[in-house]
Amino acid sequence: MTPYVVFNGATGGLGRHLGAAMADRSLSSWPIRTRLGDSAGFAHELDQLPMERGSIATFIQSAGMVSIKECEENPAAAHDVNVGRTVATVETFIDWTLSHGITPGILFVSSGHVYAPPRTGTRLTETSTVEPRSVYAKTEVEGENQVRALAAERDVQLAICRVFGMIGPDQRHHYLLPGLITRIRNGNLANIPGLDFVRDYLDTRDVSRLLASLTAGLFTAGGKPPVTVVNVCSGQEIRIRDILDQLLDLYYTDDARALAKARGSVSAALGRPTDIPWSVGDPSLLSQLVEGPIRTVPIVDTLADALAADPA
């Protein structure tokens, strides 16, 4: 049986692509517009959806407070959003579906930030040590744990997807890519924090496609998913400096002198105390669970699309 899919975070850089990704998998899906934690509003939206008794419905919980800087500046708000309101939203979905004779499933979007810092060159697996450092990561772990306990108590299907880095067009300002583009346009390329850090980035459209594939594969049978946690990652490392270099090539494609000047002005600064110099995931389990390649959008195409989506 194919599940219905309900998801939040529809206006974010990831959520805006989820509907199309679900349609490509022939999954009926609906974005939720109610603010996170508004249980009455969420239940009212669910009342309007044409989901039949005896069906399966999966809720993709992807909304949250994800700016590491904002979480550090306001830890109480981060906890309220990423734990309190998030768990309340998941519980509302479970209560509503069970009361309507629908089998619920939860796909909880978490983060690769939850892992302990690995040795350089080590790819993080689903069994790697969880040891969050930042406020954001700590709230993600607590959210995971509370949703896991709730799902176990209600005997509900749950898959936790720990997404590593995402880049894409139309991301909000606090993400890496729009931040670098703004620096290029403002000529502000000195003292970039964490410039030599190594990360694992996928295009937001690929992440949406992978979440759709996981939803179809893990929840269609109506039984327990074969996994509880899966890393959503490419396994391919890239330095933030290399992303900046590619952006500069694209931005100054017809002006070699300006390109050389811009490159000469680039310098690195220390990252945050909680930053991890190397964070790359192991996609082995993901590869077993999804159809097709993990990456379909090359990084250079992502960068070009981001520049085109945010013209000077």
Locations of the language-model features?
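Glycine-rich NAD(P)-binding loop of the Rossmann-fold in SDR/ketoreductase-type enzymes
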Residues: 73, 77-88, 130, 134, ...
